[in-house]
Amino acid sequence: MGDNIIFHRILFTLFAIFDCFLFYRLAQIVTKKINGTDFLYLSRISLLVYVFFRNLSQFTSSANNTENFGLTFLLLMVLSYLGYLNNKKSFYLITSGFCFSVLFFLKGNFALFSLPIILNIIITNFKTIKKVIWQLFLYGLPLVLHALAWLLYFYKNNAVNDFITASFIFSSKYMKSAWAGHVSPQGVFVIVLLSFVLPFFLYSLTLIKNLKKNREPELTILSYFSIISFIFIIMLGSFYPYYLLITFPFMILGFIYFWENSKPKMFKVGVLVLLFSSIFAWSTSMKQFYNFFGGPVATEAKENKAVSEYVESVTSKNDKIIAYTYGATFYELTGRNSGSRFISASVLLLDEREKYGFGFSDIYIKDMEASKPKFVIYPAGNDSLYFQNKKLVEYFENHYFENKTFKDYIILKRTPN
């Protein structure tokens, strides 16, 4: 894809349209079990709610994240498994397992979403151990083959330890830091849980309470996924709205079950709460919309462009640079490669500040010593979060000098040897 932003936008839009289509297919299957007479009406209501929340800016977050891609494979995983339950063809179970394998390597904690299927396999076949083993084998086979392929690839590149660290160990330490309140404000996380997630949890309680009564496997599995969704949210421990996106299909279908099975008074309360949550979520999204076109985000974009144009003017395409900030924005805007394997300062800060012990800052310095990037895009002022990484701040102060100043950034130039 390279740096073709238009192609990226088209790709992300196609993914969004496709997962909305997949959700509608799942909604039709589930609502038919909730109310066989009005299932088309219910499935359309669920699609309307899904499309509304799924495309709010705070949840879609530019669409370039694992949650947006994960939705497609999560929905395919569930649909494939339901297909297997209906016709018992092994192909569907293997396909479901393949989708889970993709989910797992997109983000390790997505592994939780395999538990409803594993649990259902065990419970429905517990009297026949051979069936349990065979079905678990078919479901897990793609993951094993996928893992072996990755291990072989990284083994050939002498990077197995890096692969395991980046894919699993760092994420587990990050989760611990998140729950300690060191990643994002816990207060904001709790407010969002209370205002948005909690209402959907209460809707799903009706479904979960009727777990034993529901004899339809589709509703049983939906109950399992609802429980896992809330466990997943609680385990996050940090507030980034797009983290919640992966749970939307089950929260919304839980609401539809509530819609059909609640008593009249509870139904009215539930709808009012949904309206409140919708207005709150929409208002948040509109604030981001304003910020993008006329607020701080628009101002930041102008500065980023000015900084990038300057760096581009004083470097050649083959020159390496360092952007000591979050993400890869400046590498993309300048068309210059990073002088280190690390492109975001956030990972370096977490490792150094939280004492993870990976030595990322030392590796970062070694990379810069080898590539000797001519320029560094550096935060202006001393209040930047990334000034907490004293080791890197000291390195920049000893090896670079101020070249040009912008409002939020300083361009540093490497001191001649």
Language-model regions, residue ranges each:
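Specific aromatic-rich, kink-prone transmembrane helix
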Residues: 69-86, 92, 99-100, 121, ...
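Short acidic/glycine- and proline-prone juxtamembrane loop motifs at membrane-interface regions
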Residues: 59-69, 240-241
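Hydrophobic/aromatic-rich transmembrane helices and adjacent perimembrane loops
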Residues: 236-267
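Short periplasmic/luminal acceptor-recognition loop of GT-C membrane glycosyltransferases, typified by
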Residues: 115, 297-354, 358, 364-386
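Short hydrophobic alpha-helices at membrane interfaces in multi-pass membrane enzymes
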Residues: 83-101, 130-138, 217-227
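Membrane-interface alpha helices of multi-pass inner-membrane proteins
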Residues: 91-108, 114-119, 145, 226-235
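Transmembrane-helix motifs of polytopic, lipid-linked glycan transferases
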Residues: 10-36, 51-52, 76
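Membrane-interface transmembrane helices that cradle and orient dolichyl/undecaprenyl
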Residues: 28-31, 35-37, 75-95, 195-216, ...
